[in-house]
Swiss-Prot record:
Protein name in the entry: 1-deoxy-D-xylulose-5-phosphate synthase
E.C. numbers: 2.2.1.7
Family in the record: Belongs to the transketolase family. DXPS subfamily.
UniProt-listed Pfam families: DXP_synthase_N, Transket_pyr, Transketolase_C
Cofactor note (record): Binds 1 Mg(2+) ion per subunit.
Record's catalysed reaction(s): D-glyceraldehyde 3-phosphate + pyruvate + H(+) = 1-deoxy-D-xylulose 5-phosphate + CO2
Pathway(s) per entry: Metabolic intermediate biosynthesis; 1-deoxy-D-xylulose 5-phosphate biosynthesis; 1-deoxy-D-xylulose 5-phosphate from D-glyceraldehyde 3-phosphate and pyruvate: step 1/1
Record organism: Brucella abortus (strain S19)
GO MF terms, alphabetically ordered: 1-deoxy-D-xylulose-5-phosphate synthase activity; magnesium ion binding; thiamine pyrophosphate binding
Length: 643
């Protein structure tokens, strides 16, 4: 299929070339950029809706500001694909999120036009403020622009940064990309005129002069003058909250109208004083009918047909782990009216949309606010409820202090379903669930579980629902299950007890999580090589099954631990127990397989696990090496002594 014709975009491969174009050409450039974006993402998959919504804004920013000297920071980075196309990466845009290709987010190592990496939300204003202060300290006249969506503004970190920026009176431009307004975008000449007026140098100079005069008045008159001015501006614009934080507010303006965007951005650029917030109203999926009609379904997409918008979905061999969690929790909630669910702006991603349909009054979406979500759940637990605080592994990191201080120290029975455990493929290191086992198993009294398949996940949901002695977590990966038979309802597992899945005599493979299937495949291959192999499912990283570990250590020559986590997790706890229990004293050969001590780049999960040695081949190779055998399983001949 031929690529779309983009004659203007072809002339603007970098921002300096873009800035050479006359303003009257920019609307056509934006349309070509939108066409290129749709065509590229249709072949790669990725985040489409957010990028379509900021096409005109991206063109305007790079036309008005002197990037990369001026810094543009994209919060989260979902919307940065148009930015990548315009900043010298168009020739690689069809490698998005592929192994060895472009990242799906901004990335410092990828381009000088990406001054700050992003993927988690609400960091842009803090980073931008740091850059703005650094520029001032260095005597630079650099503009720093943070582009943040209204969803990211639900996180407290954004307001902490704005409060600090206002107090410092820093030269920082924040663009609030509001794509979720319940009213239509502002239209007409009056709206555009007001935005130009309040962003202009004359208005702001008069306003500053009036402030200086007002400071000489009695305080009660100062307050009245300030409130009158705020009321008058808020009548047209509505920026009182941001003004209270010390920002000069401009907007709202139509983010798809370059005739409105360009003069406002120029005015703000040319006025070198204090922090400014520009409120821009956009539409997710703008310019592509299927995405406009169903913005939620086109936030993140698989490959799709550009004409019909139909997404390609590979056939599922089994329900996803996320769906199994959601349906299992519904089943438990039918038996226990104390069960409630908490999510931090990810009801669909965590499967709690299903729970919400069944129990709308027992699910709470707190927004992008993981810290609040954890302590909110702790409050529910303190009153006798059974909160399931479902958060992706990577996002639980944001609420770790609350996990320690508000949940663990008080031993409150908050349940933590941890989705996206292990590698997540195309989203790369920013979204990998590598660290939760380590940072949760370090906490006294915390029960830490990992499901090896979808049936085990159902058992762990039931176990967590029944467990009231303290905090408990269970982790499970992204993607489909392995296709095992599912019980109608899970069983309650004995805390701290694993299970033997396959009996052997020489080699023991102890798995924590869904690498169990690879361990079973490795056991078959090892058996064919004459190495009788036991496979065990640990189930618990804390408390460990000491009896199971003793048996594996005493009855086998080789013990290999296998997990989908970073250094310091399950294997570390097993090794500590082996050492303190004296089980290493008799010459047991112990090996630990885990994620490498690097941030693995994006790629296909299977290939990434193979790279880490966490597939069947890697496990077999590890056992052979421990027994001094070659890759065919033959005993290696001793190296002859040479004088």
């Amino acid at each position: 299929m031929s690529r779309p014709s983009t004659p203007l975009l072809d002339k603007a491969p970098t921002p300096d070339r873009l800035r050479a174009l006359p303003e009257q050409d920019l609307p056509q450039l934006a349309e070509e950029l939108r066409t290129e974006l749709i065509d590229a993402v249709s072949t790669t998959g990725g985040h489409l809706g957010a990028g379509l919504g900021v096409v005109e804004l991206t063109v305007a920013l790079h036309h008005v500001f002197n990037t990369p000297y001026d810094r543009i920071i994209w919060d989260v980075g979902h919307q940065a694909y148009p930015h990548k196309i315009l900043t010298g990466r168009r020739d690689r845009i069809r490698t998005l999120r592929q192994a060895g290709g472009l990242s799906g987010f901004t990335k410092r190592a990828e381009s000088e036009y990406d001054p700050f990496g992003a993927a988690h939300s609400s960091t842009s204003i803090s980073a931008g403020l740091g850059m703005a202060v650094a520029s001032e300290l260095s005597g630079e006249k650099r503009n720093v622009i943070a582009v943040i969506g209204d969803g990211s503004m639900s996180a407290g970190m954004a307001y902490e940064a704005m409060n600090n920026a206002g107090a410092l009176d820093a030269r920082l431009i924040v663009i609030l990309n509001d794509n979720d307004m319940s009213i239509a975008p502002p239209t007409g000449a009056m709206s555009a005129y007001l935005a130009r007026l309040v962003s202009g140098r004359t208005y702001r100079s008069v306003r500053e002069a009036a402030k200086q005069v007002a400071q000489k008045l009695p305080k009660f008159l100062q307050d009245k003058a300030r409130k009158s001015e705020e009321y008058a501006r808020a009548f047209f614009t509505g920026g009182t909250l941001f003004e209270e934080l010390g920002f000069y507010y401009v907007g709202p303006i139509d983010g798809h109208n370059l005739d409105h965007l360009l003069p406002v951005l120029k005015n703000v650029r040319d006025t070198q004083k204090g922090p400014v917030l520009i409120h821009v109203v956009t539409q997710k999926g703008k310019g592509y009918a299927p995405a406009e009609a169903a913005a939620d379904k086109y936030h993140g997409v698989n490959k799709f047909d550009v004409i019909t918008g139909k997404q390609a979905k590979p056939p599922a061999n089994a329900p996803s782990y996320t769906k199994i969690f959601g349906t299992s929790l519904i089943e438990e909630a039918r038996h226990d009216d104390k069960i409630v669910a908490v999510t931090a702006a990810m009801p669909t991603g965590t499967g709690l949309d299903l729970f919400g349909e069944a129990f709308p009054k027992r699910v709470f979406d707190v927004g992008i606010a993981e810290q609040h979500a954890v302590t909110f759940a702790a409050g529910l637990a303190s009153e006798g409820y059974k909160p399931f605080c479902a958060i992706y592994s990577t996002f639980l990191q944001r609420g770790y202090d609350q996990v320690v201080h508000d949940v663990s120290i008080q031993n409150l029975p908050v349940r933590f379903p941890i989705d996206r455990a292990g590698l997540v493929g195309a989203d790369g290191p920013t979204h990998a669930g590598s660290f939760d086992t380590g940072f949760l198993a370090a906490l006294p009294g915390f029960v830490v579980m990992a499901a090896s398949d979808e049936a085990e996940l159902r058992h762990m949901v039931r176990t967590a629902a029944e467990y009231d002695e303290g905090p408990i977590s269970f982790r499970y990966p992204r993607g489909d299950g392995v296709g095992v038979d599912l019980p109608e309802r899970g069983s309650v597992l004995e805390i701290g007890k694993g299970r033997i899945v396959r009996e052997g005599t020489k080699v023991a493979l102890l798995s924590f999580g869904t690498r169990l299937q690879e361990c079973l495949a490795a056991a078959e291959e090892l058996g064919a090589a004459g190495l009788s192999t036991t496979v065990a499912d640990a189930r618990f990283a804390k408390p460990l099954d000491h009896d199971l570990i003793r048996r594996l250590a005493r009855e086998h020559e080789v013990l290999v631990m296998v997990e989908e986590g970073a250094v310091g997790g399950f294997s570390s706890h097993v090794l500590q127990f082996l050492a303190t229990d004296g089980l290493l004293d008799r010459g047991l050969k112990v090996r630990a397989l885990m994620l490498p001590d690097i941030y693995q780049d994006h790629g296909k999960p299977d290939a990434m696990y193979a790279e880490a040695g966490l597939d069947r081949t890697g496990i077999v190779r590890t056992v052979f090496a421990a027994l001094h055998r070659d890759e065919l399983g033959h005993e290696a001949l001793p190296t002859p002594f040479r004088a």
